[in-house]
A protein has these predicted regions:
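Conserved nucleotide-binding/hydrolysis micro-motifs of P-loop NTPases
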Residues: 117-118, 187-192, 246-248
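Short N-terminal helix/helix-N-cap motif within the alpha/beta-hydrolase-1
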Residues: 168-171, 194, 251
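Phosphate-binding active sites in nucleotide-utilizing proteins
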Residues: 79-175, 185
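Acidic, metal-coordinating catalytic cores used for nucleic-acid/nucleotide bond scission
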Residues: 164-165, 245-249
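PAPS-dependent sulfotransferases, especially Golgi type II membrane carbohydrate sulfotransferases
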Residues: 2-13, 18-86, 132, 139-153, ...
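Conserved beta-strand scaffold positions in the cores of enzyme catalytic domains, especially
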Residues: 112, 182, 238-240
Length: 320
């Protein structure tokens, strides 16, 4: 691999893949400096092939915020009912959403559907940012989501939708699907940012921000501001779970989540690592084994290389 990445005029896609693979080898044997250099080279190769600007996410949050500040959402009595109740798990990628989905989906009444793109597509296909009547919008979102989720191949009563980026749409969920549950995952901000940077997100939709430390920091700020906004206008509406506290006592944490969801406790929930449902995220190893602790401290080994994201978090008063 070391010889391959030195070949002149090597395709950027190959540079990306070779450098990433080699960086992981170096990190595994604690050779941090060469590992980080190769990781950065892999990320640079990716950004050379992809034109990305964080401004789209910033503008998206501004539009959502303005819409909810300028409209009133009366409580609605909907004619249609959900036979399969959605459980949304939201938060930053790498905040523990996959682990919680694996645990909760081990319950006999819950089906883990993974990262569904249903809700973002519905919102994007609506005209909520063009002075849409709020009631019409709520009906549209509800009907469309109900239609899509009813087609999932399961008879279980609860469906987990683990699309992390649904944090943008908390207000839409609360008003159009009031029977839904929303679990919001927290984790140490630097642990999240470092984990986003070092993860292999090259082929993941929506993860273009994760290939530069600066855009990771800026995206985290957007996420933080978005959740702060939802908590201000809809206080105490979410099931809040701190990943670091959860892994210290996942037995009590699991029981608390199951209770908050209104489900009866089942001991098999604690055997989540035996749940052989398909997992298609970077968290595969985490959900296949017992919970491990202290992973949120790993970023400190790489701290001197993470200055750009550290400065962004500090400048926005985000503690870590």
């Amino acid at each position: 691999l070391e010889e391959l990445i030195e070949i002149d005029n090597l395709d950027n896609k190959l540079i990306q893949n070779f450098c990433y693979a080699l960086s992981k080898i170096y990190f595994d044997i604690d050779k941090i400096e060469p590992g980080f250099k190769l990781l950065k080279k892999a990320k640079t190769a990716y950004t050379a092939l992809n034109n990305y600007s964080i401004s789209e996410e910033k503008n998206h949050f501004i539009k959502v915020k303005q819409y909810f500040l300028s409209n009133k959402f009366p409580k609605s009595d909907f004619n249609n009912t959900f036979k399969k109740i959605p459980i949304f798990i939201i938060g930053m990628p790498r905040s523990g959403t996959s682990l919680i989905e694996q645990i909760v989906s081990t319950h006999s009444k819950v089906y883990g559907a993974g990262e569904l793109t249903i809700l973002p597509k519905i919102i994007h296909n609506s005209i909520w940012d063009k002075n849409t009547n709020p009631q019409e919008l709520l009906n549209f979102v509800r009907e469309e989501y109900l239609s899509k989720i009813s087609k999932l191949n399961t008879n279980k009563e609860f469906i987990i939708d683990k699309m992390p980026f649904n944090f943008f749409y908390v207000g839409f969920i609360l008003n159009s699907i009031p029977e839904a549950k929303i679990i919001h995952m927290h984790r140490n901000p630097m642990a999240i940012c470092w984990s986003n940077y070092k993860a292999n997100f090259f082929d993941n939709i929506g993860m273009d921000y994760a290939h530069k430390l600066e855009t990771i920091g800026e995206f985290y700020v957007i996420y933080n501001e978005t959740m702060k906004f939802w908590n201000e206008i809809y206080p105490n509406s979410l099931i809040e779970v701190d990943y670091d506290n959860f892994v210290m006592d996942y037995v009590s944490g699991s029981k608390s989540i199951i209770e908050d969801l209104g489900l009866n406790w089942e001991d098999k929930v604690l055997k989540f690592h035996e749940n052989n449902r398909a997992v298609e995220t970077n968290s595969l190893l985490q959900v296949r084994y017992q919970v491990y602790q202290n992973s949120s401290k790993n970023w400190k080994k790489y701290e001197k290389y993470l200055t750009p994201v550290i400065e962004i978090l500090k400048n926005n008063n985000i503690k870590f």
